[in-house]
Curated annotation (Swiss-Prot):
Keyword Metal-binding: yes
Known catalytic reactions: a beta-lactam + H2O = a substituted beta-amino acid
E.C. code: 3.5.2.6
Biological source species: Elizabethkingia meningoseptica (Chryseobacterium meningosepticum)
Function description: Confers resistance to the different beta-lactams antibiotics (penicillin, cephalosporin and carbapenem) via the hydrolysis of the beta-lactam ring.
Family named by the database record: Belongs to the metallo-beta-lactamase superfamily. Class-B beta-lactamase family.
Pfam families assigned: Lactamase_B
UniProt cross-references to PROSITE patterns, sorted A to Z: BETA_LACTAMASE_B_1 (PS00743), BETA_LACTAMASE_B_2 (PS00744)
Name assigned to this protein: Metallo-beta-lactamase type 2
Subunit organization: Monomer.
UniProt GO MF annotations: beta-lactamase activity; zinc ion binding
InterPro entries found in the cross-reference section: Beta-lactamase_class-B_CS, Metallo-B-lactamas, NDM-1-like, RibonucZ/Hydroxyglut_hydro
């Protein structure tokens, strides 16, 4: 927890990030650490344009993509951009929960020949909704090694959804929070139609306890560079619960 509380000062380090020029204005790629990149895609929800963030890792075997661009119209542009920059193909895709901004690319990546993964819980939800599913599934927690690169998928508990997981890159000390972590500029909890707000706080604490030495947190939407996102998420949950209590 101590490491997470000190993340604010690290925001200054983002001024040196390398931003790549993309042909598609709805895709932005920024280098975060060594071979780890944050990609941001944009889409419209209920008339408002939002940014969705995720990451990809360039390994000696190929590229590992966490989640997917938000919208089918961006899939090919995204993979073309990766090949143009790195000369490598996507070999693995992992969805951090069942929503389209995370699992929407499973079918596309699978057709490219990439190994696609999700938790069994996410797979069950996708099956019920008759949506494309990952080829491989696993229980809530799993460690991966691709070439020389190691990373871990961790299920902290319910929050934004029942099935949300985070991804930890230990060498770079980067936590991909997905949608269970709200950005520092979020005004509220966002879409909570499938949320478990009463469980969310404990799930965030589980993340803090599991990964006490995080240096960078990539929130699922909007400004991922604001490293107050973990604490801000807790604050937003508390505010929501207080409002609910006052209205009852």
């Amino acid at each position: 927890m101590k490491g997470l509380k000190g993340l604010l000062v690290l925001a200054l380090g983002f001024t040196g990030l390398q931003v790549f020029g993309q042909q598609n204005p709805d895709i932005k790629i920024e280098k975060l650490k060594d071979n780890l990149y944050v990609y941001t895609t944009y889409n419209t929800f209920k008339g408002t344009k939002y940014a969705a963030n995720a990451v990809y890792m360039v390994t000696d075997k190929g590229v590992v993509v966490i989640d997917s661009p938000w919208g089918e119209d961006k899939f090919k542009s995204f993979t073309d951009e990766i090949y143009k920059k790195h000369g490598k193909k996507v070999i693995m895709n992992i969805a951090t929960h069942s929503h389209d901004d995370r699992a929407g690319g499973l079918e596309y990546f699978g057709k490219l020949g990439a190994k696609t993964y999700s938790t069994k819980m996410t797979d069950s939800i996708l099956a019920k909704e008759n949506k494309p599913r990952a080829k491989y599934t696993f229980d809530n927690n799993k460690s991966f090694k691709v070439g020389k690169t190691e990373f871990q998928v961790y299920y902290p508990g319910k929050g934004h959804t029942a099935d949300n997981v985070v991804v930890w890159f230990p060498k770079d000390k980067v936590l991909v929070g997905g949608c269970i972590v709200k950005s520092g500029d979020s005004k509220d909890l966002g879409f909570i139609g499938e949320a478990y707000v009463n469980d969310w706080t404990q799930s965030i604490h589980n993340i803090q306890q599991k990964f006490p030495d995080v240096q960078y947190v990539v929130a699922g939407h909007d400004d991922w560079k604001d490293q107050t996102s973990i604490q801000h998420t807790l604050d937003l949950i508390s505010e929501y619960q207080q409002k609910q209590k006052a209205s009852n």
